[in-house]
A protein has these predicted regions:
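Membrane-interface helix-loop junctions and terminal tails of multi-pass membrane proteins
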Residues: 1-258
Length: 258
């Protein structure tokens, strides 16, 4: 259904608006399922309460897969400003297209977060810890040290964007078989398992900032603050990591296999 809607947007409103619409849908699905699994694990009286980190990382991997498969044919399913920045540097998209991706990603992330709020509406009041409520929307560090937290996000996003460029490279056999999206989802799963412990692996500015804004404005009972003092970390770190990954990929690997 969502893929059909994305196709309609492309046909009726021309390719660039189709990109915006597709990224709204894809990123909305990403956040609905990704933040949704976090809410399922953390919120009181959820049937999945306390099911743990493995469930969260698996859920985020599936969220990437669903969002990307839904709109991939219409926009490429960036779903992430750091990916968009990396692909812009790599030359896959133009600067005039990039801002349309950014816009769609932010709107989609906010819509997805709102749907998570609605889905778990009855559980917010029964959850006492405001930190758990915030964690259902945005990331936070296990140990707060801004320098190291930024570095962690740079490393995680570097792996993500470098991996995407490698997986999607023209010489890869998986491009013809339709496995690219599945491999990217597994890449995100691997990043979460291996590198997600220190900061919760935002690796996506829209994934963190959009839901954090929604946390701030939604009437969530006993929600506490939105931790704006940390909010720049999961924005700046992923953007740096995505840019460095594209620069490194082009310098070391380029457009042809080794």
């Amino acid at each position: 259904m969502f893929a059909h809607l994305a196709a309609v947007l492309v046909v009726v409103h021309k390719p660039h608006l189709g990109i915006v619409g597709s990224e709204i849908i894809g990123t909305g699905l990403l956040i609905l399922l990704g933040d949704g699994v976090v809410a399922a694990v953390l919120l009181a009286k959820s049937k999945a309460e306390n099911s743990g980190w493995i469930v969260i990382t698996l859920g985020w991997g599936m969220a990437v897969m669903v969002g990307a498969y839904s709109v991939g044919p219409f926009s490429g399913a960036h779903l992430n400003p750091a990916v968009t920045l990396g692909l812009w540097i790599h030359g896959s998209i133009t600067g005039s297209m990039a801002w349309k991706y950014f816009l769609g990603e932010m709107i989609g992330a906010m819509i997805g977060a709102f749907l998570v709020f609605l889905t778990y509406y009855l559980h917010w009041r029964d959850t006492e810890d405001p930190g758990l409520k915030l964690a259902c929307f945005s990331t936070g560090p296990a140990i707060r040290n801004y320098g190291w937290n930024v570095l962690t996000e740079i490393v995680g996003t570097f792996v993500l964007v470098f991996g995407i460029l490698a997986i999607g490279a023209p010489w890869q056999a998986n491009n013809a078989s339709g496995l690219t999206t599945l491999l990217v989802a597994l890449l995100v799963l691997g990043i979460g398992l291996s590198l997600g412990g220190p900061t919760g692996y935002a690796i996506n500015p829209a994934r963190d900032l959009g839901p954090r804004i929604m946390h701030a404005i939604l009437p969530i009972p006993g929600k506490g603050g939105s931790d704006w003092s940390y909010s720049w970390v999961p924005v700046l770190g992923p953007l740096i990591g995505g840019a460095l990954a594209a620069i490194f990929f082009d310098a070391v690997i380029g457009s042809a296999p080794l």
